[in-house]
Structures are given as C-alpha cells and as structure tokens.
C-alpha cells in the first residue's frame, strides 16, 4: 500500500459519522440574459475597466495608447511584442519590481461578480500583484 493510500485509510477510519449528499435539485442557478453585459457591469462595480477589443485591433498599440508613460511592461504572451520583461525568463520575482503594466491571460470571466480565473501560466506569478497596472486578456 502506498503512503497516500495509508493516509487515506487512516483518514477514513476516523470518520465517525457519514452523511448523504444533499439534494441540490431545488437550487436554481443564477442565469443572465446577457452574461457579457452583466460581467462588464459587475467588473466596473468592483473597480475594473473593461475594453472590448475589435477583431483586428492590435493589442500592443492599444496598451501603448492606454498606458503611454509605461516603460516596463511584463508579459509572457507570444502576441505581446512590447514586453520589456518576461516573467518566465527572469531570475526571481524581485526582478519584476518596477513593472508599470503586466499583461496576462484570463481563462474564464464570472458574470455574477466580475471575477476572472487566472491560472498560473507563468514562472513568476508576482507579475499579477507587483505590476502598477494589470491587463487581463480574456
């Protein structure tokens, strides 16, 4: 038996009372007629600024337009050609200090609260926190 199996066996043997899963059929999920509009509204309510990029619009030019004074831009996304730092190739997280704009990719926007799921797809996730401004491509 593996160490994991030993741990799980000990854990299961110490469960004194077992409960059935509750019936969730009475719960009605929240739905929105216009989920994108709801996401944009909620994001603005919590301090975000949503910009819908047109199909052929250059993201690099848009970032330069939005942040004209930005000198240090960090991103590991292949479509971002204006990045001066790559969070995958720096020696340590401290090297991201002084980043004006961090550009990352979000995977899922939540209409209910304007949150965005951002998986760690970079070596140094500090870019998400240390940047003065963050651009999330969704």
Region locations from a protein language model:
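The feature marks the mature, well-folded catalytic cores of soluble enzymes
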Residues: 1-138
